[in-house]
Amino acid sequence: MGAGTAPKGKRNRTPTHIRCRRCGRRAFNVKKGYCAACGFGRSRRMRKYSWSHKWRKKRNLSY
């Protein structure tokens, strides 16, 4: 099967992301098994990068 319109129609059945148990954001990928926001399921440590300081400062989040 190709990668066109027909396969894309199957993406509406199950959600790609569900609510994360650790951070509470809707960023836990069901297929991959880890959270895109905090890294839960991939590592025990919280996902953090130096380039995301501005975003965290705006939302009053600390490490």
Swiss-Prot record:
Tell me the protein family, please: Belongs to the eukaryotic ribosomal protein eL37 family.
Q: Which Pfam families match?
A: Ribosomal_L37e (PF01907)
Coiled coil (UniProt feature): none
Which residues take part in binding Zn(2+)?
A: C20, C23, C35, C38
Zinc-finger ranges (C4-type): 20-38
- According to its UniProt record, which cofactors does this protein need? Zn(2+)
The answer to whether UniProt assigns keyword Cell membrane to this entry is: no
Q: Which GO terms describe its cellular component?
A: cytosolic large ribosomal subunit
Q: Which InterPro entries match?
A: Ribosomal_eL37, Ribosomal_eL37/eL43, Ribosomal_eL37_CS, Ribosomal_zn-bd
- A biological process term (GO) from this entry: translation
Q: Which UniProt keywords apply?
A: Metal-binding, Ribonucleoprotein, Ribosomal protein, RNA-binding, rRNA-binding, Zinc, Zinc-finger
Q: Which cysteines are joined by disulfide bonds?
A: none
Report the co-factor binding details: Binds 1 zinc ion per subunit.
Native species: Thermococcus kodakarensis (strain ATCC BAA-918 / JCM 12380 / KOD1) (Pyrococcus kodakaraensis (strain KOD1))
Q: Which NCBIfam families match?
A: PRK04179.1 (NF003214)
Give the protein's biological function.
Binds to the 23S rRNA.
Provide the protein name.
Large ribosomal subunit protein eL37
Instruction: Give GO terms: molecular function aspect only.
Output: RNA binding; rRNA binding; structural constituent of ribosome; zinc ion binding
Superkingdom classification of source: Archaea
Query: Could you describe the subunit structure of this protein?
Result: Part of the 50S ribosomal subunit.
Q: Does the keyword Protein biosynthesis apply?
A: no
